[in-house]
């Protein structure tokens, strides 16, 4: 039961008692045949009178909530507007599901989905369930006092023309919801609970779904030469981990995989270049990129995706102590390239550098996508509703952009020009880990690009969308779980065979 909500299906002709009865109307307030039957004459007349008195016009994402009259199979009537015919032609079913779940709350409801000049496909209904599950998510396990409604679980019964025709798509959507919820849970966890070793242990539970999991400890990282990642970790009492997840779902096991790489800084104090106190508590979410990768692997394995996908995350804690790495240190990365440390708070790119190099050298992927809450500069550039995309490949960039648009997780492609690469040249090493005040998101991407060889690659800077992002109809959580829906859509459309 993903998202704390139970969802079932029944035919349009079904009848029931109690709970909410949800119907949809356009801006003409016309009811579909099935909705009229469910409401009966008393309910239909009440809706017409109430709409007139409340000036309810059926606009998109508007609602009218009424006590049900005698003779109607419900305790409440919830009438949700879908807007004009033009609005109804471009319904975002995921958002509609979230909006509906928000109006129902922690109650049981029957939702009549049909008519109004459109046919809801199995995919539409599945997207509706996805939105409802994501809206119903709560992270409250550390609260000792809960409201009664927090203890209750919502239950939606969707009335559709053919229940059996939508169940397979709905199961796939539930797998995606579970992946998003896992990612949200990971981001929301406090860092004293989700330290690197514990994070790696939780990821190892994906083996129950058929995912192969390998954990690299400090000894192994030293053996292969992950000097950049280890430098970041050396100020923490908690040892770092690198976790490799392998989902081999393609018919051809030898087919090169898609590789997803995530930054997993479970807490970022800034290290010796320490952050200011205000807002530092949010730095538990500096592992949002890794959470998206873990959530995506969970989703792909749960729905048995026909694709080979590698997930790799570098998990560290960036802390200041007597052993911490310092500005002016020079560290040697796994690639052999040397890095002059200018700012210890630019640590995520050091973590990603070693993981990117390890993945491309070991697994020979057909493409690599990394996700990271990497820079505050991307928030200045794009705000908190869209992620920054940097890429060395137009085709991959286009696929990611289209998948994000379809999934409701939008990206905007940013430039990668030689000037950004030149900005990270160092007098003392092969490169430095910051490029100055200007173009911070772009110079960070240019740094990562130095760890990518001849393979299509994209970098998603999700600092604005991964945590504390704008609330929406499908997300009221601090940790958004951003990226799981985009990556699942990308795999579904371009990598499954």
From Swiss-Prot:
Compartment(s) of residence: Cytoplasm
Reaction(s) catalysed by this chain's protein: Release of an N-terminal amino acid, Xaa-|-Yaa-, in which Xaa is preferably Leu, but may be other amino acids including Pro although not Arg or Lys, and Yaa may be Pro. Amino acid amides and methyl esters are also readily hydrolyzed, but rates on arylamides are exceedingly low; Release of an N-terminal amino acid, preferentially leucine, but not glutamic or aspartic acids
CDD domains the record matches: Peptidase_M17
Residue positions binding Mn(2+) 1: 268, 345, 347
One of the record's GO cellular component terms: cytoplasm
Pfam families associated with the record: Peptidase_M17 (PF00883), Peptidase_M17_N (PF02789)
Active-site residues from the entry: 275, 349
Cofactor binding mode and count: Binds 2 manganese ions per subunit.
Reported cofactor(s): Mn(2+)
EC identifiers of the protein: 3.4.11.1, 3.4.11.10
UniProtKB keywords: Aminopeptidase, Cytoplasm, Hydrolase, Manganese, Metal-binding, Protease
UniProt GO MF annotations: manganese ion binding; metalloaminopeptidase activity
Signal peptide boundaries: none
Xref: SUPFAM superfamilies: Macro domain-like (SSF52949), Zn-dependent exopeptidases (SSF53187)
Coiled-coil stretches noted in the UniProt entry, renumbered to this chain: none
Main location: cytoplasm
One record GO biological process: proteolysis
Domain of life: Bacteria
HAMAP family: Cytosol_peptidase_M17
Family stated for the protein in its record: Belongs to the peptidase M17 family.
NCBIfam families: PRK00913.1-4, PRK00913.2-2, PRK00913.2-4
Function: Presumably involved in the processing and regular turnover of intracellular proteins. Catalyzes the removal of unsubstituted N-terminal amino acids from various peptides.
Protein name: Probable cytosol aminopeptidase
Lineage summary: Bacteria, Pseudomonadati, Pseudomonadota, Alphaproteobacteria, Hyphomicrobiales
């Amino acid at each position: 039961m993903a998202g704390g909500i139970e969802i079932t299906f029944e035919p349009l002709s079904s009848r029931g008692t109690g709970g909410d009865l949800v119907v949809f109307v356009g801006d003409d307030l016309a009811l579909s045949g099935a909705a009229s039957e469910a409401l009966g004459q008393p309910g239909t007349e009440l809706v017409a009178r109430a709409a007139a008195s409340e000036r309810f016009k059926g606009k998109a994402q508007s609602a009218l909530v009424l006590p049900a009259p005698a003779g109607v199979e419900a305790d409440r009537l919830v009438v949700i507007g879908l807007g004009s015919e033009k609005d109804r032609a471009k319904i975002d079913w995921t958002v509609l599901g979230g909006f509906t779940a928000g109006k129902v709350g922690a109650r049981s409801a029957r939702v009549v989905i049909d008519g109004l000049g459109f046919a809801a496909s199995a995919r539409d209904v599945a997207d509706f369930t996805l939105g409802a599950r994501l809206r119903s998510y709560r992270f409250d396990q550390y609260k000792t006092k809960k409201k009664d409604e927090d203890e209750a679980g919502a239950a939606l019964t969707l009335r559709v023309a053919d229940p059996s025709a939508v169940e397979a798509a709905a199961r796939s959507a539930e797998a995606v919801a579970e992946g998003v919820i896992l990612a949200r849970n990971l981001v929301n966890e406090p860092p004293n609970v989700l330290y690197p070793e514990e994070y790696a242990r939780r990821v190892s539970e994906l083996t129950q779904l058929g995912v192969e999991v390998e954990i690299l400890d400090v000894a192994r990282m030293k053996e292969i030469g992950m000097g950049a990642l280890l430098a970041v970790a050396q100020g923490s009492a908690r040892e770092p981990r690198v976790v490799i997840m392998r989902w081999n779902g393609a018919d051809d096991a030898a087919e090169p995989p898609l590789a997803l790489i995530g930054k997993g800084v479970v807490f970022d104090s800034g290290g010796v270049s320490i952050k200011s106190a205000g807002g530092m508590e949010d730095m538990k979410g500096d592992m949002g990129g890794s959470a998206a990768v873990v959530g995506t692997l969970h989703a792909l394995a749960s729905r048995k995706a026909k694709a080979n996908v590698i997930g790799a995350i570098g998990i560290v804690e960036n802390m200041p102590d007597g052993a911490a790495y310092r500005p002016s240190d020079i560290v040697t990365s796994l690639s052999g390239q040397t890095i002059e440390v200018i700012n210890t708070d630019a640590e995520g790119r050091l973590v990603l550098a070693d993981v990117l190099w390890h993945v491309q050298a070991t697994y020979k992927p057909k493409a690599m996508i990394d996700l990271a809450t990497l820079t505050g500069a991307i928030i200045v550039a794009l705000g908190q509703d869209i992620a920054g995309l940097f890429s060395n490949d137009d085709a991959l960039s286009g696929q990611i952009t289209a998948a994000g648009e379809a999934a409701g997780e939008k990206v905007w492609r940013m430039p990668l020009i030689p000037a950004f690469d030149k900005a990270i040249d160092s007098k003392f090493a092969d490169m430095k880990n910051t490029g100055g005040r200007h173009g911070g998101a772009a110079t960070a991407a240019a740094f990562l690009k130095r760890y990518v060889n001849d393979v299509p690659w994209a970098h998603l800077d999700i600092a604005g969308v991964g945590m504390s992002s704008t609330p929406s109809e499908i997300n009221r959580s601090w940790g958004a779980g951003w990226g799981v829906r985009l990556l699942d859509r990308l795999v579904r459309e371009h990598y499954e065979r």
